[in-house]
């Protein structure tokens, strides 16, 4: 809250300590850092990524996640994900100790 009220700027390391910077890379290695993050995201179900993004964006627009859920009767992308093949594939792959094969449906 203090940063919002004062407009105080912070560097990358402090931003990471505060939790709004994911990774601080040495000079010249930001592309490699971004690729590491992209690779981790790509390991996830496309439907779960879509649902997560929808929840965050709708929550910002509605003044909070709870307000957005109430306004929409829940998040459409979350409902779709919970009825998807990917919803079954994640726990199944975990139980079988193998990487999941996401279908995006």
Description of each model-found segment:
Residues 15, 52, 94:
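Terminal peptide-recognition signature
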Residues 18-19, 97:
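Structural motif
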């Amino acid at each position: 809250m203090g940063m919002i009220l004062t407009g105080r700027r912070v560097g990358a390391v402090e931003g990471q300590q505060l939790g709004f910077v994911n990774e601080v890379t040495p000079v010249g290695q930001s592309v490699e850092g971004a690729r590491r993050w992209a690779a981790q995201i790509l390991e996830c179900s496309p439907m779960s990524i879509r649902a997560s993004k929808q929840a965050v964006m709708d929550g910002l627009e509605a003044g909070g996640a709870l307000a957005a859920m109430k306004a929409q009767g829940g998040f459409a992308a979350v409902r779709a994900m919970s009825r998807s093949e990917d919803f079954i594939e994640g726990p199944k792959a975990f139980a079988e100790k193998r990487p999941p094969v996401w279908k995006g449906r």
